Amino acid sequence: LEDYIKIGIISDALRNYLLRLGWSYKDKEIFTKQESIDLFDLSGVGKSPSKLDMNRIFSINETYIKTIDEKDLFNFFKEYVLKYKKPIDQTKENVLLKSMGFLKNKAKTLEDIWNNAQYIINDKVEIGADDKKLIDDLSRKVIKDFASEYEKLSALSRESLESIIKS
């Protein structure tokens, strides 16, 4: 189990995958822990042998990442980072929590969220020489103003970002 968790599989998603190996309940694919307990019945166990399907594990994990409450997802992410990555500065945790809605969009694993969050986690963003030429004084001011307003947000959403951009 540790190897799956190490690559960023959420324990609840792995439990769901293991539950579905050889067992089914109607057309339902995703089960909460309580549903698993309430609905499991030996009559739903099939006779066919089961085989490991990593794509299916990633698919179930992605579903969990996309549908789980963002605070709960952040807690899974924080636990994952503390165990397998470097500690995150406390000041960045709030930004990560606010950004979880965006960070999870293209993620299938907690590792993907880690990779997607590097621009938040790392203090410095590398800007290439060609790109630096494109940033004039007005652009710097716009970026600083945006960053200042972004820090004040209590929750990150499309609407809140649009509001900052339009102001």
Language-model features and meaning:
Residues D69-S167:
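Small-residue-rich helix-loop
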